[in-house]
C-alpha cells in the first residue's frame, strides 16, 4: 500500500528539462552547472541532470557533493556556498571547484591543499548589489585574484556573481557587463584568460531569451528551471519546452466538511506567531489533507492540479483546501495532487515524513 504524503519525481522529465536548458545556453556560448540542492541532492535527480548534459553538478551542501563523488568519481562538482573553515579538507576532496569570497579562507584553503598534496580551483565571487556573498570593492577583488594566482595550491578558475537570492536584484546587461569588465581587468593582470565568468543562476535566463546576455558570461548555475517548478512564472519569463510537472506532491484527504471560512472568536496569532489575513466567504466545503508546513514549507505555494481546488493555508501538519466547486469528486482517503514552488520542493525532498517515488516515464 502506498504511503502519503508522497513526492513523485519524474526523472525523464527532469532529464528533458535539463537538455532544454543546456541547449538554450549552448546557443549563447554558456555552459550549465546543474544545481541539485533544491531537490536535496536526491541521487536519481542528480543522474537525470547528468543525462541532460550539464557540465557539472553544484550544491551548497558538502554531504550532497560527497555522495555524488562516491558514486560518480569523475563527475565535476561545484561548491556554491563559501566554505566554512571546518570543512576545507572535504572541499578539497569532494568539490572540484568552489565559490570563494574571503581572503582568510583562501589562505587556509591553500595551506590545506599543500598539506594534502592537492590543488583546488576557485571562482571568486563579486557582489554586484544583491548584498549576499562577494567582494564589494574592485580593489579587494583584484587583490584576491592576485593572491590566488600566486598561491601554490589554488587555481584561479574565474569570477562569478549571485543576483536575486537575497536582495531581489535582477540581472541585466549593466550589472553582468560590469562582471565581464572585472574579468577582463583580471585577465590583463595575470596575463591569461579566465576559464569561467559565472553570470548567476536561474534569474539570469531572461537575458538569454531576449539576447541581452553580455558575451563574456560563459556559465550559469541553474537548478529550479531544470527542476521544472513555477519559478519562471514568479520571474515573469517562460522557457519553451519545459515540463511544469517533473515533481508532484500527493497528499491524502483526511476530513471533508462544510464550515465557516472566518475563524470564530478573538483573533490572536497562529502557531508560528503570525497574524494571517482571513476572508469571510461564508460556509463552504473544506478539506484537510495530511501534509503541512513541516513537510512542504509554505503550503500556499502549492498548486493543485485540479484547478477547482484552492489552498486556504494550514499549520505544521495540515493543509486546508476549498473543495466547494468539486466536493462530489473527492471522498475521505482520496489523493490530491500538486505541483510546487522552490520552497515546497526543498522541504518535501528533504523531509523523512514525505515518501519518495521515482518514475522513469
What is each of the regions a protein language model found here?
Residues 17-20, 27, 38-51, 64, ...:
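N-terminal capping/small domains of soluble enzymes
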Residues 1-9:
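Generic N-terminal amphipathic, Lys/Arg-enriched alpha-helix
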Residues 6, 97, 320:
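Short aromatic/hydrophobic contact patches that present stacked aromatics
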Residues 14, 37, 68, 124, ...:
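Conserved, mostly hydrophobic/aromatic
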Residues 177-361:
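Active-site anion/phosphate-binding pocket segments in diverse small-molecule metabolic enzymes
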Residues 1, 22-25, 125-128:
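N-terminal small/glycine-rich loop or linker at the start of catalytic domains
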Residues 30-184, 189:
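Active-site-proximal beta-alpha core segment in soluble small-molecule metabolic enzymes
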Amino acid at each position: 500500500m502506498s504511503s502519503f504524503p508522497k513526492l513523485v519525481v519524474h526523472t525523464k522529465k527532469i532529464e528533458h528539462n535539463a537538455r532544454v536548458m543546456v541547449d538554450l545556453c549552448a546557443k549563447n556560448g554558456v555552459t550549465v552547472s546543474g544545481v541539485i540542492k533544491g531537490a536535496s541532492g536526491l541521487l536519481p535527480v542528480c543522474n537525470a541532470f547528468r543525462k541532460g548534459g550539464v557540465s557539472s553538478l553544484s550544491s551548497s551542501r558538502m554531504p550532497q557533493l560527497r555522495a555524488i563523488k562516491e558514486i560518480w568519481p569523475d563527475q565535476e562538482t561545484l561548491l556554491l556556498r563559501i566554505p566554512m573553515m571546518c570543512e576545507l579538507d572535504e572541499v578539497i576532496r569532494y568539490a572540484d571547484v568552489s565559490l570563494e569570497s574571503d581572503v582568510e579562507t583562501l589562505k587556509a584553503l591553500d595551506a590545506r591543499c599543500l598539506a594534502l598534496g592537492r590543488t583546488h580551483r576557485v571562482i571568486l565571487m563579486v557582489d554586484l548589489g544583491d548584498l549576499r556573498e562577494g567582494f564589494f570593492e574592485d580593489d579587494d577583488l583584484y587583490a584576491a585574484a592576485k593572491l590566488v594566482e600566486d598561491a601554490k595550491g589554488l587555481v584561479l578558475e574565474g569570477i562569478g556573481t549571485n543576483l536575486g537570492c537575497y536582495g531581489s536584484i535582477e540581472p541585466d546587461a549593466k550589472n553582468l557587463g560590469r562582471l565581464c569588465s572585472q574579468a577582463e581587468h583580471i585577465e590583463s593582470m595575470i596575463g591569461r584568460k579566465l576559464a569561467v565568468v559565472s553570470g548567476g543562476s536561474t534569474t539570469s535566463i531572461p537575458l538569454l531569451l531576449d539576447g541581452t546576455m553580455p558575451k563574456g558570461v560563459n556559465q550559469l548555475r541553474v537548478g529550479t528551471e531544470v527542476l521544472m517548478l513555477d519559478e519562471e512564472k514568479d520571474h515573469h519569463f517562460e522557457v519553451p519546452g519545459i515540463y511544469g510537472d517533473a515533481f508532484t506532491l500527493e497528499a491524502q484527504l483526511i476530513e471533508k466538511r462544510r464550515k465557516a471560512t472566518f475563524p470564530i472568536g478573538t483573533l490572536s496569532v497562529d502557531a508560528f506567531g503570525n497574524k494571517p489575513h482571513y476572508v469571510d466567504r461564508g460556509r463552504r466545503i473544506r478539506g484537510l489533507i495530511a501534509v503541512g508546513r513541516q513537510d512542504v514549507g509554505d503550503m500556499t505555494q502549492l498548486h493543485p492540479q485540479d484547478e477547482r481546488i484552492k489552498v486556504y493555508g494550514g499549520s505544521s501538519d495540515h493543509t486546508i483546501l476549498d473543495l466547494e466547486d468539486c466536493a462530489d469528486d473527492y471522498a475521505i482517503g482520496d489523493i490530491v495532487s500538486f505541483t510546487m514552488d522552490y520552497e515546497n520542493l526543498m522541504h518535501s525532498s528533504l523531509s523523512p515524513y514525505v515518501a519518495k517515488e521515482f518514475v522513469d516515464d
